[in-house]
């Protein structure tokens, strides 16, 4: 999964953003599991990049009204 820029995220449809968000969350979960198990991740900086990309997607969703207030 590639790291996305804000302009790329804004060009996506709400459904595409939601699908991308789920993929990134799954990848982040797997990366954190490897780290917690004591393994060395392939790219240690990837975890922070995943977190930032997830935040970017959620920010755009909030701006465009795609994200409910309770999330």
Swiss-Prot record:
<comment type="similarity">
    <text>Belongs to the universal ribosomal protein uL29 family.</text>
</comment>
<dbReference type="GO" id="GO:0006412">
    <property type="term" value="P:translation"/>
</dbReference>
<dbReference type="InterPro" id="IPR036049">
    <property type="entry name" value="Ribosomal_uL29_sf"/>
</dbReference>
<dbReference type="GO" id="GO:0022625">
    <property type="term" value="C:cytosolic large ribosomal subunit"/>
</dbReference>
<keyword id="KW-0689">Ribosomal protein</keyword>
<protein>
    <recommendedName>
        <fullName>Large ribosomal subunit protein uL29</fullName>
    </recommendedName>
</protein>
<dbReference type="Pfam" id="PF00831">
    <property type="entry name" value="Ribosomal_L29"/>
</dbReference>
<keyword id="KW-0687">Ribonucleoprotein</keyword>
<dbReference type="InterPro" id="IPR018254">
    <property type="entry name" value="Ribosomal_uL29_CS"/>
</dbReference>
<dbReference type="InterPro" id="IPR001854">
    <property type="entry name" value="Ribosomal_uL29"/>
</dbReference>
<dbReference type="InterPro" id="IPR050063">
    <property type="entry name" value="Ribosomal_protein_uL29"/>
</dbReference>
<dbReference type="GO" id="GO:0003735">
    <property type="term" value="F:structural constituent of ribosome"/>
</dbReference>
């Amino acid at each position: 999964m590639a790291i996305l820029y804000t302009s790329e995220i804004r060009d996506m449809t709400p459904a595409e953003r939601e699908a991308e968000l789920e993929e990134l969350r799954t990848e982040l979960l797997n990366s954190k599991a490897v780290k917690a198990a004591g393994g060395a991740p392939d790219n240690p900086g990837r975890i922070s990049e995943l977190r930032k990309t997830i935040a970017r997607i959620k920010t755009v969703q909030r701006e465009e009204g795609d994200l409910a207030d309770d999330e």
